[in-house]
Design a protein with these regions (language model features):
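Signature (C-motif/LSGGQ) region and adjacent switch/coupling loops
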Residues: 29, 85, 113, 129, ...
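Conserved ABC ATPase "signature" region
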Residues: 79-80, 127-144
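Short coil-to-helix segment of the ABC ATPase nucleotide-binding domain corresponding to the Q-loop/switch region
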Residues: 110-119
Length: 151
C-alpha cells in the first residue's frame, strides 16, 4: 500500500488527455493518433515502441511542442502547450524537454568546436563559447577532436 501512495505523490511531469493528430493530405484526412491518454510522473522513464507508421514520431513531436494536436491536450510540468504562444513554447522546450533525434548530424563544414558554438549561439548561450566547447569536449575525452570536422 505504501508503494502506491508514494507513487501517487510524485509530480505529474507529462500528461496527455484524449490526444489526437490528423494529417491532411489534400482533401484526405489521415489519422495518426487517436485518444492517447498518458501520465508520466517525475523520475519515470518511458519507452515508445511500435511498428513503422504507428504514430511514435508524431506522439513525440506533440510531446515536444513541435506539432499542435488536432484535439486533446499535452501538459508539460503543468503547462498546456496548446494554450501558450510560440515564444513560451520555445522556452518550455529549452528548459523542460530534451530531444535525441534518430538522425542527428553535425554540419560537415564546421569543426567539432564550431558545431558546439553554433548550437549554443542558436540557443542564446553565446557567452564563453570557446571555453565551453573546449570544456565539453575535454569532459567527453574528445579534446583531440576540437578542430576536426565530422567527415
Amino acid at each position: 500500500m505504501s508503494k502506491t501512495i508514494g507513487m501517487s505523490q510524485k509530480k505529474d511531469v507529462v500528461v496527455t488527455e484524449n490526444l489526437q493528430m490528423v494529417y491532411r493530405i489534400g482533401k484526405v484526412e489521415v489519422p495518426a493518433l487517436r485518444g492517447v491518454d498518458m501520465t508520466v510522473k517525475e523520475g519515470e522513464f518511458v519507452a515508445v515502441m511500435g511498428p513503422s507508421g504507428c504514430g511514435k514520431s508524431t506522439l513525440l513531436h506533440l510531446l515536444g511542442g513541435l506539432l499542435t494536436p488536432s484535439a486533446g491536450s499535452v501538459r508539460i510540468d503543468g503547462i498546456d502547450l496548446a494554450s501558450i504562444g510560440d515564444n513560451k513554447r520555445t522556452e518550455v522546450r529549452r528548459n523542460k524537454i530534451g530531444f535525441v533525434f534518430q538522425r542527428y548530424n553535425l554540419l560537415p563544414t564546421l569543426s567539432a568546436e564550431a558545431n558546439i558554438e553554433l548550437a549554443k549561439r542558436i540557443h542564446g548561450n553565446g557567452h564563453k563559447l570557446e571555453t565551453s566547447a573546449r570544456e565539453l569536449l575535454t569532459m567527453l575525452g574528445l579534446e583531440h577532436k576540437l578542430h576536426h570536422k565530422p567527415s
